[in-house]
Design a protein with these regions (language model features):
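His/Asp/Glu-rich metal-coordinating catalytic cores
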Residues: 1-86, 90-104
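Generic long, charged, amphipathic alpha-helical segments
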Residues: 204-235
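Hard-cation-handling environments
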Residues: 60-192, 247
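Long, charged, low-complexity intrinsically disordered regions
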Residues: 142-145, 186, 198-208
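Short beta->alpha connector loops
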Residues: 17-20, 45, 160-163, 174, ...
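Structural motif
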Residues: 10-11, 37, 154, 181, ...
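Short, conserved loop/helix-junction motifs that constitute active-site signature segments
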Residues: 30-34, 101-103, 173-178, 210, ...
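A short, acidic, amphipathic alpha-helical segment used as a generic capping/interface helix at domain edges
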Residues: 61, 165-174, 224-239
Length: 250
């Protein structure tokens, strides 16, 4: 609120939102109160971005299941807050990781110190360590050992756009091998490494070294934290404002 004399003006900011997203670590979006100006996101404002969460999530789950069955090592770059939780939930519900390797479930490595701290904060609600054979990797030494291993595994690491984080270190070992796969689960800005790989780059520059991209690349469509066209229209039609300023648009 901005007060000037007896006049009070209210500006509201939506931030990123998805009206269908469910999470134990992020509260559902609530309608803004009456505002003079609303500054709202419209990342996926193109009507062609519409999708059915239930139907299209099923397709994503089938894609994940097929990748786990077919490939040796799978890297899933992910944002530490909420996205990691969504991925772990889908891995558990698809039951794909229950396939046995040497009598054990396929291990799922959560290789991100921040994501591990968030997971521990919500461990009672999430509880995937036994369900998924989930292993929390916090030290750099543990991460290096996993990077250089050739065991069958699923690695969930930040960052989602590959502009920082341990996912970059894993890429060096994942990409050259055609028996490996990378599963992207979110938006990638045009100036990011994730964008290059998603759009077919056959080689990338990483730490001054040219790395061949022989891995299989998958793009999942239903993990975004941004509302699609229909959700945006419904949300903005149901809040009260004098002026709407749309930002963060395609």
């Amino acid at each position: 609120e901005i007060k000037q004399g007896y006049s009070i003006k209210r500006i509201g900011f939506t931030g990123d939102f998805n009206t269908e997203a469910k999470s134990v670590s992020v509260s559902p979006i609530e309608p803004l109160p009456r505002c003079n100006v609303v500054v709202g996101e419209c990342t996926y404002s193109d009507p062609t971005r519409c999708y059915s969460m239930k139907k299209d999530r099923w397709y994503d789950e089938q894609m994940i299941n097929a990748a786990i069955c077919q490939y040796n090592r799978i890297l899933m770059p992910a944002f530490s807050l909420q996205r990691v939780e969504d991925i772990l939930d889908v891995l558990w519900r698809t039951r794909a990781t229950e396939r046995k390797v040497d009598g054990q479930m396929i291990p799922v490595y959560l290789d991100s110190p921040l994501a591990c701290r968030i997971y521990r904060a919500w461990s009672e609600q999430l509880d995937y360590e036994d369900k998924l054979n989930l292993r929390l990797i916090e030290s750099w030494e543990e991460s290096q050992a996993i990077q250089q291993s050739n065991e069958r595994a699923i690695i969930v690491a930040s960052s989602g756009m590959l502009n920082a984080g341990r996912a970059l270190a894993h890429l060096k070992y994942i990409l050259p091998n055609s028996r490996n796969a990378v599963l992207f689960s979110g938006y990638a800005s045009p100036n990011t490494l994730a964008y290059e790989i998603k759009h077919g780059a056959k080689e990338i520059m990483l730490d001054g070294e040219m790395i061949q991209n022989n891995a299989q690349i998958y793009c999942l469509n239903t993990f975004s934290s941004h509302a699609n066209y229909n959700q945006l229209m419904q949300y903005y039609q149901n809040i009260d404002y004098d002026k709407l300023c749309l930002v963060h648009s395609e």
